Amino acid sequence: MTILRKSHPLMKMVNHAFIDLPAPSNISGWWNFGSLLGMCLIIQIASGLFLAMHYTSDTISAFSSVAHICRDVNYGWLIRYIHANGASLFFICLYLHIGRGIYYGSYMYKETWNIGIVLLFLTMATAFMGYVLPWGQMSFWGATVITNLLSAIPYVGSSLVEWIWGGFSVDKATLTRFFAFHFILPFIIAATAMVHLLFLHETGSNNPLGIPSNTDKIPFHPYYTFKDFLGVIIILALFLTFVLFFPDLLGDPDNYSPANPLNTPPHIKPEWYFLFAYAILRSIPNKLGGVIALVLSILVLALFPLLHTANQRSMMFRPISQFLFWTLVSDLLVLTWIGGQPVEPPFIIIGQVASILYFSIILVLLPVAGLIENKILKW
């Protein structure tokens, strides 16, 4: 008789994906972030569901309903802070996951990589709309500024913005539709993540050496199920420590003031995980140019498979590319810092230099480094 997990139609799918899946024997802790992102998504959907039970998407009562959740709902404060900081954890894991993909050449699995980029866009859209829902000062003005960027699109821009707003300013219609989209998008993300996994399992995982691992595979369970579980425990412990001791560290104090269309905050800025893109947007004086740069700052990831010139897949044995990779990481940290600073000297020029360096490393320096390394390493 066949084992149930190998014969039952549903369990067979789970078996092929998480139990009998052949996996490379040498994948490191950097391969844990896929499962951690799955954990983040589950945490966000669960906490978000409970928040949605008590939240009201109306401009008059939205801010009060969030205060009510924190004060009157049993453990509402905990659910709210888990959800708010869960978004930060989600993006930390996302950026580390993408960084791993760039460093070890995982982008050579083109379908998996491109669906990953779609997932990134979906997650960014979800996070942006979620930030609007508490209807604080930064929620309102962040929504106004970011949606207004679409007005830079020639000919249809103004009509498009009013269509998204559902009126002539960010108001009740905007809040209601943002709540609806914020609720549905995580389920679309979950479905897209399944497709992401489907394509990954067509090729199998990459590994730190960037070489085929068909000669040395091990079953996913128990080796990587336990390894992933350890990662989940460590990250959860750090996350809960953060939520319980420093819940407001990453938030903006302005969001504790109710939205007021008549009073603009001195510095409008998004959440920390969007600051690098916001800095690139602000570094170009032209509105349309800034919007194009903003979109390209993420879309440029799709060019990685096309710009791969090295004969080795991974950066593990390519010192010039390694140097450029860590310069890129440092550059992104500088952009994140600049995005949170006011638009005044010397921050303007630092942001412009960092933006140019960001695109230069990806589009020019890394491909050139690959060619140089081919020569040096006699490939």
From Swiss-Prot:
Q: Where does heme b b566 bind?
A: 97, 196
GO process annotations (BP): mitochondrial electron transport, ubiquinol to cytochrome c
Keyword line: Electron transport, Heme, Iron, Membrane, Metal-binding, Mitochondrion, Mitochondrion inner membrane, Respiratory chain, Transmembrane, Transmembrane helix, Transport, Ubiquinone
Chain positions recorded as heme b b562 binding sites: 83, 182
> Quick one: where is this thing mainly located?
mitochondrion
Pfam families hit by this protein: Cytochrom_B_C (PF00032), Cytochrome_B (PF00033)
> Membrane-spanning regions, if any?
33-53, 77-98, 113-133, 178-198, 226-246, 288-308, 320-340, 347-367
What does the cofactor section's free text say about binding?
Answer: Binds 2 heme b groups non-covalently.
Q: Which GO terms describe its molecular function?
A: metal ion binding; ubiquinol-cytochrome-c reductase activity
InterPro entries this protein is in?
Cyt_b/b6_C (IPR005798), Cyt_b/b6_C_sf (IPR036150), Cyt_b/b6_N (IPR005797), Cytb/b6-like_sf (IPR027387), Cytochrome_b (IPR030689), Cytochrome_b_C_euk/bac (IPR048260), Cytochrome_b_N_euk/bac (IPR048259), Di-haem_cyt_TM (IPR016174)
Positions annotated to bind a ubiquinone: 201
Instruction: Please give the GO cellular component terms listed in this UniProt entry.
Output: mitochondrial inner membrane; respiratory chain complex III
Membrane topology listed for this record: Multi-pass membrane protein
Q: Which PANTHER family match?
A: CYTOCHROME B
Family affiliation: Belongs to the cytochrome b family.
Its subunit composition reads: The cytochrome bc1 complex contains 11 subunits: 3 respiratory subunits (MT-CYB, CYC1 and UQCRFS1), 2 core proteins (UQCRC1 and UQCRC2) and 6 low-molecular weight proteins (UQCRH/QCR6, UQCRB/QCR7, UQCRQ/QCR8, UQCR10/QCR9, UQCR11/QCR10 and a cleavage product of UQCRFS1). This cytochrome bc1 complex then forms a dimer.
Q: What else is known?
A: Heme 1 (or BL or b562) is low-potential and absorbs at about 562 nm, and heme 2 (or BH or b566) is high-potential and absorbs at about 566 nm.
Say what the protein does. Component of the ubiquinol-cytochrome c reductase complex (complex III or cytochrome b-c1 complex) that is part of the mitochondrial respiratory chain. The b-c1 complex mediates electron transfer from ubiquinol to cytochrome c. Contributes to the generation of a proton gradient across the mitochondrial membrane that is then used for ATP synthesis.
Name of this chain's protein:
Cytochrome b
